[in-house]
Every structure is written in C-alpha cells, then in structure tokens.
Amino acid sequence: MKEHVYFVNAHPDDLIACMGLCMRLSTEERFEVHVVDVTRGERGLSSKGVSMTECAAIRTKEEEAVCGAMGLKSQWLNEIDGEACASKQACQALADMFIAKPPRAIFTQWPVDRHLDHMVCSTIALNALRFSAGVTAGQMKTVATEVYFYAYASNSIGFVPTHYFPMDEEAMDKKFALISKYECQNGVGMARQDRIES
C-alpha cells in the first residue's frame, strides 16, 4: 500500500521551492505524490494586461505540464490569486483529499511570508489536516502526519531550514528543465536563480 505525500502550494509555480524533493519522491515506488495548488495564479500576468481567465488557463497548463513530466496530476482548491483566505470550502476540499488518501507527509509554504497567498496556503493545509483528523474537546483525535515547511529566500520571513535535500548535477539539470516550463513566469530565469540559491 502506497503512502501519500502532499505538496500544497499557493500558486502553480510555487512548487519550484521543493521541486527536487517532489521529483525524487515521485520516482519512489512506496509513495503516491499529490500536488495541490490553492490558486491558479490568475493575477500572475496582470502587469502585462493579461486577463485573469487567460492567465489562469496559461498557468494551469504550465503546472499540468510540469506535473505530467513527473508522472503526477495537479489538483486545485480554486481560491483566487491575491484573494486567498483559507475559506472553509478550500480547507474542506483538501481535507476530503486527506480523508480519501491519508497523508504520510505534507509539504507546504512557511506561514510567515510577504505574499498573503503563501501565508494562507499553510493555514489551509493545517486546517485540512485538523478537519480530516477529527476534533474532540479541541484536540485532534489522531495525527500521524509529518508536516514540513519550505520557504523562498526573497519572500519568507524568519525561516530557519532544518532539513536539506541533496541533489547531484543530473537531478539539478532535470529540476532546471522542469522549472523552465513555467514560461509565463520567466521559468528559465527562476531556474537560474534557484540553481544559485541551491
């Protein structure tokens, strides 16, 4: 029986912060990896005059291409980029995923961040875990789920890493190629920056 691992991200390209680990776990027989995005990144091209609907379609397609290259499917909670607020509907939708396929581990964004959607993302993940576990007298009934946070050097505040994931040159090249698929968000530039920060 496979163990379920969830990567819960605010936007389609936020997976880049933990791409190496996602790549590795997606090749492990014992794990089924789930990529869940809170929003479709609808406002990611607003400075270029692209409508939210068109932007969502572009970014959804890019995320599906990246996930598809790893043999994964992306799932969506349908909050709106820039307006995500950990709605009960989003938390319950993720909780329903957790109930159907209980998580062994959850990787999500560090909750102290300059981007509000990043902050909300971890709240949704933790609320969904709480909803799926059930609560008695304010205490979660059972939780055997590991929760890990990832961060961005430019956005996250006060994050001190405690775990590192080693990658060889071949894995870095694959990671670079995957990140480059996020073309509308300057994927090649992000991949170069990520390589420098790694």
Give, region by region, the residue ranges found by the protein language model.
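ATP-dependent adenylation/pyrophosphate-handling site
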Residues: 3-52
